[in-house]
Amino acid sequence: EMSASLVGSEMCIRDRYDMDGGDVASSIYYGLFSLQHRGQESCGIAVSRTDGEKRNSQMIKGMGLVNEVFDAEKLEQLHGDIGVGHVRYSTAGASIPENTQPLVLNYIKGTLMVAHNGNLVNAVDLRRELELMGAIFHTSIDSEVIAYLIARERLHVGTVEDAVKLAMQKIRGAYSLVVASPRKMIGARDPFGFHPLCIGKRDNAYFFSSESCALDTVGAEFVRDVAPGEIVTITPQGIQSDRSMASDKCARCIFEYIYFARPDRYIDGICVHSSRLTAGKILAQEHPVDADIVVGVPESGNAAAMGYSMESGIPYGTAFVKNSYVGRTFIKPKQSARESSVMVKLNALREVVNGKRVIMIDDSIVRGTTSARIVKMIRDAGAKEVHVRISSPPFMYCLL
């Protein structure tokens, strides 16, 4: 975020539809663990089920990590055959309980469960327009604007997917979107393909996920990515695709490859680990330096450091011990929290860097919080020289 190309993106969506009417909450719960790196401020799960002729929805959400919000007792309260899960990093809207996703909207046509990853550039104008028509907002997030737009359009068209399409014609910005109604699940991606969204299948259960690693966690097979501008509708009758919103121009978020995504996932057919490895090799070609060892800043800098080492012939080393109980510093909501997190997250291995000329590879500089403190950490551990190399070129003016 900040000066990189994910300004205002709320972190991740995951949705599951079980054609056999099974319970989905546990699958969503485990899948969210695989997406925890994308957002650590809050999370939630909403499910829906049929009781006789009546459709009931349930939702549990709260501030904190997945394992802090949910336990066995809470999961037992969630019974449904369709559900939506979400983990959040706040960008548009404050980090408060009211802004936790997913959103459940009850209206004259029934119930919608909505989760959104992205940021709208015209959200303020759309919110004002909806308020003038009588809408009352309970959050400050873009996702509620999208949910209200879909619900309002649904009053005038025959299907939820048609309502999603009409809403997409009005919203501008970056979004990967999941909408679940009682008997169908819809995944949509903005025409530029800014953020990822993929489809998975396990037996008769279907999934949408921001990253394919969540599919692996629940034993689902990766089917394909949702294409930029595509609306995918899943019902008991099968899968339907509408690509009429597709654009000739794609503008994928480069920061997904640089930082956000897990290295074991693929985005639009490109392996994240391989892209980072290649970036490190190019960095060694363009910015060589004579040194004794190449080290990466865990975790997203490691692959680029390996690539730099492979290309330069300088040995690769592990210079840091990481505290696995500390989250990603970049997605902490406050500067003070980011600075404190750096100090407890990493510690330098004196045995590795003492008396050596060190090339330190990091994936990017967003706020500079991590890099400055880690350079001091390596120097304090006895390094003679510290040469910082950044595997991402600067991106200054992304509005999304």
For the regions a language model picked out, list residue spans one by one:
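Positively charged, low-complexity/disordered segments
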Residues: 1-8
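Flexible loop/turn segments at secondary-structure boundaries
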Residues: 91-92, 122, 186, 194-195, ...
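ATP-dependent adenylate-handling active sites, centered on carboxylate activation for C-N bond formation
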Residues: 287, 332, 352-357, 373-384
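Conserved short alpha-helical segments that host acidic/polar catalytic motifs at enzyme active sites
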Residues: 9-10, 14-228, 233-291, 297, ...
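Amphipathic alpha-helical
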Residues: 145-158, 298, 310-328
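Short, glycine/charge-rich flexible loops or terminal/linker lids adjacent to PRPP-binding catalytic cores
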Residues: 313-359, 369, 396-399
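Extended, hydrophobic alpha-helical segments in both membrane/secreted and soluble proteins
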Residues: 294, 301-308, 312, 316, ...
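A short, conserved beta-to-alpha structural element at the edge of catalytic cores
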Residues: 376-400
